[in-house]
Regions:
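Carbohydrate-binding surface patches
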Residues: 383-422, 460, 464
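C-terminal beta-strand-rich structural cap/linker in extracellular carbohydrate-active enzymes
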Residues: 446-471
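Noncatalytic carbohydrate-binding groove/subsite architecture in carbohydrate-active enzymes
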Residues: 204-318, 327
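N-terminal module-boundary/linker segments of secreted carbohydrate-active enzymes
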Residues: 23-55
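Aromatic/acidic polysaccharide-binding cleft in carbohydrate-active enzymes
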Residues: 299-367, 371-373, 377-386
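Structural recognition of the beta-strand scaffold that forms the well-ordered cores
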Residues: 40-46, 69-77, 112-116, 189-193, ...
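Substrate-binding cleft and catalytic face of glycoside hydrolase catalytic domains
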Residues: 65-253
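Bacterial N-terminal signal peptides
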Residues: 9-17
């Protein structure tokens, strides 16, 4: 018997006699297979800055990308910069967006920026611009159009001249943005062409491919072409209906996907765990993977798992994140990061001007995942009971095993590592217990390295096991 084998057997024998974290009659086994799947990248969403206060810029940036070791931050391409063709307004970027981006880089020099066109309805004032909107748009509603009217391609416009997209203007608009950021010393790693509304390209993929090819020819010499993100549809169902199954794409899916850096969708209709269309999510992911198993697949605006004033909701709604990872999504942009104390329950951090920021349980759960494994890989796992929803991520030797108890009673969760893998050092246990109404986890430790361990997970609660492994 080798010394290493003898040591492992000795450790296992010693630890077998240790008590589990509590005791329960109901035991569920989570088996970690060791099969490495897609790389995982996590980002925060700063596309909407309604509650990013300049006087709190340092504090909010540190919370967003300093404490959180995210890969990327989603930022806005602001239509207010050139609402009318040829008339630019630098304050659309210089007032808040550029200072925020530079402060982000201060706290995370390796942060990558993901630029996304912000809906144009935010550029117009419903009162002072009422006549202009009424003259140009049905019912005066610009909808979710992501580009200025002069670029064309808007489905709600009344005037025919704007109905067809001008591909060269579209490419120029995006290149101008990238060049402006470059002059400010800000490189953009990912560029989204859409933001839910797909009317710009009119179902003709040649429009999109033309723009992808045209942008690099318009960039300053010092500016690098970002990865293209497309189509960021309203829902995974739209990803099939309005992208993959569109006639101009359906017959040449492989060719089209090669030209796109990241295939993306939103899941806007999924308000919470009870309205989550998991089947639609899986169908879209499977369709992409069937064409290109290694294609980067992102949710560029993940809804449903939102920061609330109720930690128990944050805990249970986290199932939406775990299901995305299980479906094969490699990039998650959580929408939104900054928000108000009162109002839509989207934010990860509530940042009311007078009261200062307040973190949510979602923030703490996300931090637990991101800071241990962002940039790592998703690892296949299986649960012996559907009440326990597992997710396993690994970065180098660091592993995070997540187990969500969706049931109404406590469950003893036994985690089994694959053959030949064992724990080095202690297992850190982070528990978010719904009944405690606390955003922060209770932390305890398993003192001994073993190949499997058991822990009690209370009803409707979430546990993360953070550990270092050896093979």
């Amino acid at each position: 018997m080798t010394p290493k084998r003898w040591m492992l057997l000795t450790i296992a024998a010693a630890c077998a006699a240790l008590p589990a974290f509590g005791a329960a009659n109901d035991t569920v086994t989570v088996t970690v297979t060791g099969e490495l799947r897609q790389p995982v990248h996590f980002g925060i969403d700063a596309e909407r800055l309604w509650f990013f206060w300049p006087e709190r810029r340092e504090q909010l940036a540190e919370m967003a990308v300093g404490r959180l070791k995210v890969d990327f931050a989603r930022v806005a391409i602001n239509g207010a910069y050139e609402r009318e063709e040829g008339v630019t307004n630098i304050s659309a970027y210089s007032d808040v967006i550029i200072p925020m981006m530079k402060t982000f880089r201060k706290y995370n020099p390796n942060l990558r920026f993901f630029a996304s066109p912000r809906p144009m309805k935010e550029v117009y004032n419903s009162k002072t611009d009422a006549k202009w909107l009424a003259d140009n748009f049905r019912n005066g509603n610009i909808g979710m159009a992501a580009y200025p009217l002069w670029v064309g391609g808007h489905k709600r416009v009344v005037k025919r001249v704007y109905k067809k997209v001008d591909k060269d203007k579209w490419a120029r608009y995006l290149a101008d943005y990238l060049n402006l950021m470059g002059r400010e010393g800000l490189d953009v790693a990912y560029l989204d062409l859409m933001n839910e509304d797909q009317s710009m390209w009119g179902g003709d993929i040649e429009n999109v491919l033309y723009v992808i090819d045209r942008i690099p020819t318009l960039l300053d010499r010092s500016v690098t072409m970002p990865k293209i993100v497309f189509p960021s549809t309203w829902s995974p169902g739209d990803g099939l209906k309005k992208f993959l199954n569109v006639p101009s794409v359906a017959a040449r899916r492989g060719e089209v996907l090669k030209r796109i850096g990241v295939v993306a969708t939103h899941n806007t209709p999924d308000a919470n765990r009870n309205k989550f269309d998991e089947a639609g999510l899986v169908a879209f992911a499977d369709a992409v993977r069937a064409v290109d198993p290694d294609k980067e697949l992102w949710n560029t605006e993940m809804h449903g798992w939102v920061g609330t004033r109720s930690p128990s909701d944050d805990i249970l709604n986290s199932i939406i994140l775990w299901r995305h990872l299980a479906a094969g999504f490699s990039g998650i942009d959580t929408w939104l990061f900054f928000g108000p104390w009162k109002g839509a329950a989207h934010p990860m951090v509530y940042s009311n001007r007078g009261h200062g920021p307040e973190m949510t349980a979602k923030y703490e759960i996300f931090k637990s995942v991101v800071n241990d494994t962002c940039g790592g890989r998703y690892v296949a796992s299986a649960s012996s009971d559907k009440r326990i929803v597992p997710a396993v991520l690994m970065k180098e030797r660091r592993m995070l095993v997540s187990a969500l108890n969706t049931g109404d009673g406590e469950i003893a969760v036994r985690v089994r590592l694959p053959e030949g893998m064992h724990v080095s050092g202690r297992v850190e246990r982070r528990l978010w217990e719904a009944s405690k109404d606390d955003i922060s986890p209770r932390i305890s430790h398993l003192e001994c390295g073993v190949q499997d361990w058991t822990s009690i997970v209370p009803a409707r609660s979430l546990v993360h096991f953070a550990l270092t492994v050896e093979k």
